[in-house]
Amino acid sequence: MKFEITKFQSLNYMGHEAFNTLSANLSFAGGDIKKIMVTSCSPHDGKSFVSMNLMRSFSQIGLKVLLIDADIRASMLQKRYGIKIQDEGYKGLTEFLAGRAKIEEIIAQTDIPNADMILAGKTVNISFPLINSGHLDELFGAVVDQYDIIVVDTPPIGAIIDAALIAAHCDGVLLVLRSNYTTQAELKDAISQIERSGKPVLGTVLNQFDTWKFGKKSESHKYYYNNSYYRDNSSKSEKGKEKKKKNKD
């Protein structure tokens, strides 16, 4: 089975460099850090954007990577990135957690070399029983030795319990923050929940940093990871749309 990703925007030079730095830093975290959860404090912070670009960056440095879309309540990843599925009867993570699909049925190659994906599948309103079913342990146990890196894109941490539960199955957490939006209280609460899972915060990514607000005329947003950043070029009209309607995560 294969997925075709039809709406994956190319990054500019700074974007490639920043994600290369981020993926390299994460790969240097140690051999015991393979399952990396990517989450945020609230919807529309850009966690899925970071997850997808991490998948691409890891694959470009020669690592075999698996991206798991674990937002089984409200995933927009397939729609946003125009992911076309060859098999119309594809079953995703939800179906596997419910015991209605096998592991080999939910993993698919993408058109990016070295990069495989598991999509969320059918969305559900109540996810707690599925995440706690024991099948998540089974999944990670089966794939951890097949890949160099596993990126797990989860719902935002805090509003619902899903991300905190999934964190317990991962080796560390990357937290995506939205510039001029994420509050200190939200950040503290997110870190507290991650720490209660017993897993380390591997780093934070500052997303949608707008240089216009700081007197520098630039039609771009900067995204920071520690001392690295990239610009995602966007027009003023896109910024206007952001004010009227939040971009889907």
How would you label these PLM feature ranges?
Residues M37-T39, L119-A120, V152-D153, L175-R178, ...:
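Conserved beta-strand segments of the P-loop GTPase G domain that flank and frequently precede/overlap
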Residues V50, L54:
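Hydrophobic positions on the alpha1 helix immediately C-terminal to the Walker A/P-loop
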Residues K2-H16, N20, A24-G31, S40-H44, ...:
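P-loop/Walker-type NTP enzyme "switch/lid" segment
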Residues A142-D148, A159-N180:
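Inter-motif core of Ras-like GTPase G domains
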Residues M76-L77, I126-F128, Q184-A185, T211-K216:
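Switch/connector loops and helix/strand junctions flanking conserved nucleotide-binding motifs
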Residues F58:
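Aromatic pocket-lining residues of Rossmann-like dinucleotide-binding sites
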Residues K2-I5, K188-D249:
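Hydrophobic micro-sites
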Residues K47:
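Conserved lysine of the Walker
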